Swiss-Prot record:
Protein name: Large ribosomal subunit protein uL3
Gene Ontology biological process terms in this record: translation
Matching HAMAP family: Ribosomal_uL3_B
The keyword Nucleotide-binding belongs to this UniProt entry's keyword annotation: no
Xref: PANTHER family: 50S RIBOSOMAL PROTEIN L3, LARGE RIBOSOMAL SUBUNIT PROTEIN UL3C
Length: 209
């Protein structure tokens, strides 16, 4: 059964498992999320729930969005996301989705926005080899060949070059839930997940598990 929740990355730490081995974990504050809208096949052409997460000041929300929340009879949320689930009928507008929908040992996929690195060269961005660093060499960290000469007389699309790195949507598959702490809305995930601390993430049960 598909399930999903929105959360906020708090940072990384390490805990000991039952065999006293150190396990690196990422701590995520997941939920509580509020169901703001239900989409149906008859009205929208597909089934999904729209979920809100995070507090936001009223003056930062525009009038159309404020009306959307008022119509649902729920509080304002910083983030709105849609999830296509198989059991949409089991959810009601205003219902809260909490971290206890996941259990320890479960496999999940985590989607977030990777850390932005700004403008980076080809070595850092694409892991290219650098040139000789010895005296007399005039080629150190440059791109090198960008393609052929008079034919085709152009550089092909997708040629690896320097440019903006990071700050893109990224998903890590098949991570393991180590522990959930429902009273604090925390979920401990084995390993690292995309994005900086305080970055928003979406946690779904794994599509490959």
């Amino acid at each position: 059964m598909k399930k999903a929740i929105i959360g906020r990355k708090l940072g990384m730490t390490q805990i000991f498992d039952e065999n006293n081995r150190v396990v690196p974990v990422t701590v995520v504050e997941a939920g509580p999320c509020t169901v703001v809208q239900k989409k149906s096949v008859e009205k929208d052409g597909y089934e999904a729930i729209q979920v809100g997460y995070g507090e936001i000041r009223e003056k930062l929300v525009n009038k159309p969005l404020k009306g959307h929340f008022e119509k649902a009879g729920v509080g304002l949320s910083r983030m709105l996301r849609e999830f296509k689930l198989e059991n949409v009928s089991e959810y009601q507008v205003g219902q809260e989705i909490k971290v206890d929908i996941f259990e320890a040992g479960e496999k999940i996929d985590v989607t977030g926005t990777s850390k932005g690195k700004g403008y980076q060269g080809i070595i850092k961005r694409w892991n290219a080899h650098r040139g000789p660093m010895s005296h007399g060499s005039k080629f150190h960290r440059a791109v090198g060949s960008m393609g052929a000469a008079s034919y085709p007389a152009r550089t092909f699309k997708n040629k690896r070059m320097a440019g903006h790195m990071g700050n893109v949507k990224s998903t890590v598959l098949n991570l393991e839930v180590v522990k959930t702490i429902p009273e604090k809305n925390l979920i401990l995930i084995k390993g690292g997940i995309p994005g900086p601390n305080k970055g928003y993430v979406i946690i779904r049960n794994s599509i490959k598990a």
